[in-house]
């Protein structure tokens, strides 16, 4: 006579075999990766790039908000200034061996310079190759925001003119005049 423990074991083995038999005739879910590309959702967060303004200048103003927002501290940059007073990063470095692709840097960027692309093929054999410099990250195009130019929106100081005297600029509002 079989003990109750062996009956339970035999029943679970038969159930497992039945499940395997049912799945035997279903289509395979394997995708042959290099030949067949997988479906990537539209908001996939992949490789990070630095974009340019419509006039070809770097969008990044080295405000350091991306580095502060990064939870794993994988972004490093140093600010410098050109002759016109425009800020730009002297160096911009992302360590992709630490990056978790959370997208906080893209959300923190006021100039839309940092953008995450759907590219996910970043495999490397050596860890130092995962540290990308500004030259590796900078693209020739404007990315997701083709018409946005930070300095047209925010403005730069114009020599000889005070606030509100430049083209397309309104004079500042006196806040005290708005009070009841």
Swiss-Prot record:
<feature type="binding site">
    <location>
        <position position="66"/>
    </location>
    <ligand>
        <name>[4Fe-4S] cluster 1</name>
    </ligand>
</feature>
<keyword id="KW-0520">NAD</keyword>
<dbReference type="InterPro" id="IPR010226">
    <property type="entry name" value="NADH_quinone_OxRdtase_chainI"/>
</dbReference>
<dbReference type="GO" id="GO:0005506">
    <property type="term" value="F:iron ion binding"/>
</dbReference>
<comment type="subunit">
    <text>NDH-1 is composed of 14 different subunits. Subunits NuoA, H, J, K, L, M, N constitute the membrane sector of the complex.</text>
</comment>
<feature type="binding site">
    <location>
        <position position="63"/>
    </location>
    <ligand>
        <name>[4Fe-4S] cluster 1</name>
    </ligand>
</feature>
<feature type="binding site">
    <location>
        <position position="105"/>
    </location>
    <ligand>
        <name>[4Fe-4S] cluster 2</name>
    </ligand>
</feature>
<keyword id="KW-0479">Metal-binding</keyword>
<dbReference type="GO" id="GO:0048038">
    <property type="term" value="F:quinone binding"/>
</dbReference>
<keyword id="KW-1278">Translocase</keyword>
<dbReference type="GO" id="GO:0009060">
    <property type="term" value="P:aerobic respiration"/>
</dbReference>
<dbReference type="InterPro" id="IPR017896">
    <property type="entry name" value="4Fe4S_Fe-S-bd"/>
</dbReference>
<dbReference type="InterPro" id="IPR017900">
    <property type="entry name" value="4Fe4S_Fe_S_CS"/>
</dbReference>
<keyword id="KW-0472">Membrane</keyword>
<feature type="binding site">
    <location>
        <position position="102"/>
    </location>
    <ligand>
        <name>[4Fe-4S] cluster 2</name>
    </ligand>
</feature>
<dbReference type="Pfam" id="PF12838">
    <property type="entry name" value="Fer4_7"/>
</dbReference>
<feature type="domain" description="4Fe-4S ferredoxin-type 1">
    <location>
        <begin position="50"/>
        <end position="80"/>
    </location>
</feature>
<keyword id="KW-1003">Cell membrane</keyword>
<keyword id="KW-0874">Quinone</keyword>
<dbReference type="GO" id="GO:0005886">
    <property type="term" value="C:plasma membrane"/>
</dbReference>
<dbReference type="GO" id="GO:0051539">
    <property type="term" value="F:4 iron, 4 sulfur cluster binding"/>
</dbReference>
<protein>
    <recommendedName>
        <fullName>NADH-quinone oxidoreductase subunit I 1</fullName>
        <ecNumber>7.1.1.-</ecNumber>
    </recommendedName>
</protein>
<keyword id="KW-0997">Cell inner membrane</keyword>
<feature type="binding site">
    <location>
        <position position="109"/>
    </location>
    <ligand>
        <name>[4Fe-4S] cluster 1</name>
    </ligand>
</feature>
<keyword id="KW-0004">4Fe-4S</keyword>
<keyword id="KW-0408">Iron</keyword>
<feature type="binding site">
    <location>
        <position position="99"/>
    </location>
    <ligand>
        <name>[4Fe-4S] cluster 2</name>
    </ligand>
</feature>
<comment type="function">
    <text>NDH-1 shuttles electrons from NADH, via FMN and iron-sulfur (Fe-S) centers, to quinones in the respiratory chain. The immediate electron acceptor for the enzyme in this species is believed to be ubiquinone. Couples the redox reaction to proton translocation (for every two electrons transferred, four hydrogen ions are translocated across the cytoplasmic membrane), and thus conserves the redox energy in a proton gradient.</text>
</comment>
<comment type="similarity">
    <text>Belongs to the complex I 23 kDa subunit family.</text>
</comment>
<dbReference type="GO" id="GO:0050136">
    <property type="term" value="F:NADH:ubiquinone reductase (non-electrogenic) activity"/>
</dbReference>
<feature type="binding site">
    <location>
        <position position="70"/>
    </location>
    <ligand>
        <name>[4Fe-4S] cluster 2</name>
    </ligand>
</feature>
<keyword id="KW-0830">Ubiquinone</keyword>
<feature type="binding site">
    <location>
        <position position="60"/>
    </location>
    <ligand>
        <name>[4Fe-4S] cluster 1</name>
    </ligand>
</feature>
<feature type="domain" description="4Fe-4S ferredoxin-type 2">
    <location>
        <begin position="90"/>
        <end position="119"/>
    </location>
</feature>
<keyword id="KW-0411">Iron-sulfur</keyword>
<keyword id="KW-0677">Repeat</keyword>
